[in-house]
C-alpha cells in the first residue's frame, strides 16, 4: 500500500500546473448490526476539496454530503439494499456501529455500479484520524486537479518533486503518478483484449456457418436436380435458376441473422443482470439499432456468398441429364 504524508500533499499542490491536491485515507473497518460483524473499506477525505466526488463521480442519493468537522458517515449505495451488506438495510439518521463506536448516518451515495465503491463508508479526514488514533495513519492516495493542456509535463514534474521529497532515484520509486487518461487507457487495453478474443470466436463461428450453409445448398441442389431440369425444359434461363438458389441461401443467412440477434440480445441482457447482481452495474450491454441492422445484413451476405457456388452449379445443370437423373 502507498503511504503519503501531509508534506507530500503540499509538495504535489505546489507543483507548477497543479490547481489543488488532497490526501485520501483508505482503511479496513469493522461494522456491526444485530450482532453480525462485517469488514468493509472506509475512506477518509477532505470535504473542503471536492476532488473525491469529481474523480469517483459520487452523487448524493439521499441525505447530504460530509461537511468540515462532521463526526458522521455517508454510506455507499449497497447499504440501502436488503441482503447486500446486512439482511436489513440502513436508513437515513440510523446509527452504524463503526469500530465499536456508534456513528450517525447522514447520507447515501448513488450507485456507481462497482461493488467495492458501493460498499464503502465515507468520513472526513479529521474523523478518520480520530477513529484510528491508536495506529499510524498515512494517506493512501493523493488526488490532484491539474492543467489538462500540459498534463504530461505536470505528471513528470509531480514525479520529480515527490522523488526529491522522498530521496529516491528515478526508476526506484515506491509510488507512481497516473493521470485519468492513463487509467482510461489501461482499462481500454484490457477491454480491447477481451473484445478481440470475442471477435476471434465470432469469426470462427462465421466460418463454420458459411461451410454449413454451403453444404445445405449443395444438398438442396442434388435433391432438386429433376426439378431444375423441368424448369429449364419449360424455358427457365441459367440466370433465373442461379437467382432462385442464391435467394434461398441469402434467405437462410437472413433468418440466421435475425435469430442470432434475438438470442444475442437475450444472452447479453441476462449477462448484464448477472453482472449487476454481483455489484458491477457499470458493465452493461447497449443495443444500438445500427448494430442489429449490420448483423442481419452481414449474415445475409454470408449466406449469399456461401450459396454462390452451389447456385452456379445448379444453373449449369443440363436439362436432358437432369430429367434422367435418379
Which residues fall in each region the model found?
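Short helix-coil transition/hinge motifs at the ends and kinks of transmembrane helices
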Residues: 1, 85-89, 165-172, 274-283
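Hydrophobic, regular-secondary-structure patches
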Residues: 1-41, 62-64, 153, 168
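Alpha-helical membrane-protein architecture signal
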Residues: 5, 180-190, 200, 239-243, ...
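Mechanotransmission and gating elements of multispan inner-membrane complexes involved in transport
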Residues: 15, 97-198
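Hydrophobic secondary-structure segments that place a key small or acidic residue at a functional site
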Residues: 24-27, 36-48, 55-130
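Alpha-helical membrane-interface segments at transmembrane helix boundaries
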Residues: 184-198, 221-222, 251, 255, ...
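Transmembrane alpha-helical interface segments in multi-pass membrane proteins
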Residues: 196, 205-272, 276, 294, ...
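Short cytosolic juxtamembrane segments of multi-pass membrane proteins
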Residues: 311-326
Amino acid at each position: 500500500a502507498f503511504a503519503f504524508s501531509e508534506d507530500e500533499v503540499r509538495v504535489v499542490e505546489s507543483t507548477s500546473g497543479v490547481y489543488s491536491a488532497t490526501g485520501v485515507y483508505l482503511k479496513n473497518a469493522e461494522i456491526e448490526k444485530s450482532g453480525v460483524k462485517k469488514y468493509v473499506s472506509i475512506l477518509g477525505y477532505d470535504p473542503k476539496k471536492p476532488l473525491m466526488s469529481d474523480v469517483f463521480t459520487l452523487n448524493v442519493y439521499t441525505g447530504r454530503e460530509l461537511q468540515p468537522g462532521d463526526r458522521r458517515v455517508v454510506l455507499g449505495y449497497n447499504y440501502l439494499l436488503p441482503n447486500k451488506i446486512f439482511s436489513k438495510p440502513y436508513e437515513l439518521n440510523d446509527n452504524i456501529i463503526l469500530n465499536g463506536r456508534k456513528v450517525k448516518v447522514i447520507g447515501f451515495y448513488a450507485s456507481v455500479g462497482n461493488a467495492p465503491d458501493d460498499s464503502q463508508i465515507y468520513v472526513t479526514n479529521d474523523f478518520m484520524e480520530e477513529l484510528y488514533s491508536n495506529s499510524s495513519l498515512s494517506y493512501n492516495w493523493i488526488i490532484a486537479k491539474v492543467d489538462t493542456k500540459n498534463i504530461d509535463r505536470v505528471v513528470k514534474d509531480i514525479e520529480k518533486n515527490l522523488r526529491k521529497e522522498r530521496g529516491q532515484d528515478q526508476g526506484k520509486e515506491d509510488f507512481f503518478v497516473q493521470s485519468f487518461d492513463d487509467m482510461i487507457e489501461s482499462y481500454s487495453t484490457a477491454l480491447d483484449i477481451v473484445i478481440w478474443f470475442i471477435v476471434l470466436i465470432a469469426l470462427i463461428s462465421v466460418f463454420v456457418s458459411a461451410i454449413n450453409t454451403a453444404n445445405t445448398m449443395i444438398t438442396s441442389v442434388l435433391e432438386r436436380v429433376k426439378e431444375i431440369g423441368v424448369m429449364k425444359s419449360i424455358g427457365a434461363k441459367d440466370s433465373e435458376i442461379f437467382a432462385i438458389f442464391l435467394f434461398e441461401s441469402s434467405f437462410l443467412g437472413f433468418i440466421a441473422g435475425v435469430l442470432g440477434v434475438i438470442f444475442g440480445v437475450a444472452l447479453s441482457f441476462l449477462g448484464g443482470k448477472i453482472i449487476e447482481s454481483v455489484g458491477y452495474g457499470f458493465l452493461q450491454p447497449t443495443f444500438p439499432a445500427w448494430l442489429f441492422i449490420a448483423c442481419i445484413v452481414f449474415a445475409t451476405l454470408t449466406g449469399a456468398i456461401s450459396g454462390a457456388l452451389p447456385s452456379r452449379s445448379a444453373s449449369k445443370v443440363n436439362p436432358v441429364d437432369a430429367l434422367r437423373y435418379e
